Amino acid sequence: MSSNQIYSAKYSGVDVYEFIHPTGSIMKRKADNWVNATHILKAAKFPKAKRTRILEKEVITDTHEKVQGGFGKYQGTWIPLELASKLAEKFEVLDELKPLFDFTQQEGSASPPQAPKHHHASRSDSTRKKATKSASVPSGKVSEKASSQQQQPVSQQQQQQPGSAPKRRGRPPRNKATVTLQRSQSEMVFPKPSIPSSSIQSTKLPSLQPQFGRSATSLSPIMDVKSPLDQASPQFKELDIEDGLSSDVEPNSIMGTKHEDNTHLMNTKDEPVSSSSSLPSSPSEFSQSVAFGSRSNMQTPLQLNGTTSMNMILPKFSSSQNGPSDSNQRANEYLSKLVNYFISNDTQNESEIPMELLNPPLHCSPFIDTWIDPEHHTAFHWACAMGTLPIVEALLKAGSSIRSLNNVGETPLIRSSIFHNCYTKRTYPQIFEILKDTVFDLDAKSRNVIHRIVSRKSHTPSAVYYLDVVLSKIKDFTPQYRIDVLINQQDNDGNSPLHYAATNKDDQFYQLLLQNGALTTVQNNSGMTPNGIISGRYSMDEITKGQRLDDPYEFNKMYPSQAATRTNRIIPEVINMMKEMANSYQNAYQKRQNEVLQMERTVKSMKKTITSVEMKLLEALNLKETDNVDIVLNDRKEKIDELQRRIATDKRVLINRLEEGQVKLIRKFVDEETKNVEGKTTDGEESEDIEALLKELVLIQLKRKRKLNQIIDVITDNSKVYKYRKMISQGTDIDVSDVDECLDVIYQTLSKEG
């Protein structure tokens, strides 16, 4: 066999080219050349959790087709050949897979040989074979061979006979009480619990705050009330169907393996008993042939058969005096249709939800919160656990309570967090946003939603996804101290979520909780701490039985337990105060940083201004470097002082000259007047005239001095005159020194134009 040999195969009725790689088969569809991306990631030797994250972040964001039903090897996420080549190249397996990617069958040429050691049966063929085998069995009896090929639910008193059938992939097969319609392989993944009839009366409406006491239960520490999925046989792990989206079934954890007797959960040999969590993870957990039985007043669940009616499972509100109200009747009719939809095969396709289910009757509270199964689940519980967002929103508008509780105190948020449906449909963030007000609610054992998620272990993809969503979204609407309280919440046995992770040896969840504020020193009722459990300080028997021996590692034990209780209560407050101090310091530090940045910007602006001034100064002084600026400025200052002294001297000389001219002119006038009056006699009147003239002369001389000073000021302070000269020079292209000589010409020109 050549290492590059391409084979032909047929899986679930689809023709493919198959390439045998050391890690498994790599497939390419013949019809459209699409390649299974999950196979490529397997060829790159990624573990399943890593493959799931890569598919989420890098593959399903582009063109893809997800195949979950049919033959196991064919399942996975299929992408076009071009995207497959890029994906293989990114993870360095392109050269290994190139024979398959480059292979093209020439028209008219022979098809590649069939893949060896494979049976390529289509899905329809396998279904027909199962139907044939089932038809050969008498009614009410199923052979061991048939039961090994059909995964249908039966009550727990029917025992499976081991060793009668070959080992199958997936969950253990179960015997079947009655022959039912054959269903495809993809619809027979989950075990189907039998559904007992209900005897709920109007006086048994679920209370929002039921009285759950510590003495009301006798279950062992940290025992998780398992769903039908969690009740699978422990030797079966989660199904490895390529992309990790099929199932979250896992064996019971260490802390959940010890179950004490409980009257509510007790199984009898004569009566079928429902699981402790009747809500299935998919509608296929119900047999289509099993209808709902008529209502009975018996408190013991009855086995249903195919002849019972559908509507009678719904508990109807009745009274011996008054008939059912119109709201009650409308609610019962709607819930009957809703239950029919939940147990049908159409729940995976939200685009085909009947419109009548999206428009429930209004104003039907509290009837819309009627229990629809013996474990007191409401329709809202079902819708949230199924991950069907449109129905969740419709029920919410109709008045459904987000705090409805089942008989073990589980809210719809907890129910949606313990099944994988919200993960498969990617509706958990939206449903959590609707139910976020109940994130702090506890069940009958004081466990919150984080307890329930962590107990499922991190190898379950949906559990990792749910915990990431919860821890990220609660930061958007609640203060940190409440988050710390939620993460360190202790159940009735004193176990925090970190105890669960430590007991399961779940390093991923353990580290994630530590990063979000979980405390390693919290003691449970047996005195065990998460740190001691994860470090192997306690034996397995101690952890399982809730007992412990003397611990040599702990020297300072705090007794009585009230001291530890007070410490545990104070720790979140201390943490909150420290975080407030840190926030205050951070705010002050940020304020100082902003001030420093502002000062740096101011200094930078000033430096820029200084540089600009220096450049202009160098240009004005006709210099190349700033080193000589001080010398040049000193020289210019000395010249200015010298010029100012010369101006003052010239000013005095000019004043003296003007004074001398004025004195000579006055003397001339005086001499002329003196000659005219010589020889004339003067009387008293003329003497008075002379005095008046002298006074007038004095005033005129004073005015003359003022005018003289004004002339000097105009001549010496000529800054405005220089500006005018410069403005005229720029407007007429005449040199500044020639402006005075051209003033008459300019004036005449302007007068003519005016």
UniProtKB/Swiss-Prot annotation:
DNA-binding region: 37-58
One annotated Gene Ontology cellular component of this protein: SBF transcription complex
Gene3D superfamilies: Ankyrin repeat-containing domain (1.25.40.20), Transcription regulator HTH, APSES-type DNA-binding domain (3.10.260.10)
Entry-linked PANTHER family: ASPARAGINASE (PTHR43828), TRANSCRIPTION FACTOR MBP1 (PTHR43828:SF15)
Keywords annotated in UniProt: Activator, ANK repeat, DNA-binding, Nucleus, Repeat, Transcription, Transcription regulation
Domain HTH APSES-type: residue ranges: 6-112
UniProt subcellular location: Nucleus
Lineage: Eukaryota, Fungi, Dikarya, Ascomycota, Saccharomycotina
Repeat region (ANK), residues: 375-404, 493-522
Compositional bias segments (type: Low complexity): 147-162, 273-289
GO molecular function terms attached to this record: DNA binding; DNA-binding transcription activator activity, RNA polymerase II-specific
Biased composition (Polar residues): 177-187, 203-215, 290-301
Region span, Disordered: 105-215, 239-301
Domain of life: Eukaryota
Protein's organism: Kluyveromyces lactis (strain ATCC 8585 / CBS 2359 / DSM 70799 / NBRC 1267 / NRRL Y-1140 / WM37)
Assembly behavior: MBF contains SWI6 and MBP1.
Job of this protein: Binds to MCB elements (Mlu I cell cycle box) found in the promoter of most DNA synthesis genes. Transcriptional activation by MBF has an important role in the transition from G1 to S phase. It may have a dual role in that it behaves as an activator of transcription at the G1-S boundary and as a repressor during other stages of the cell cycle.
Name this protein carries in UniProt: Transcription factor MBP1
Ranges of compositional bias, category Basic and acidic residues: 257-272
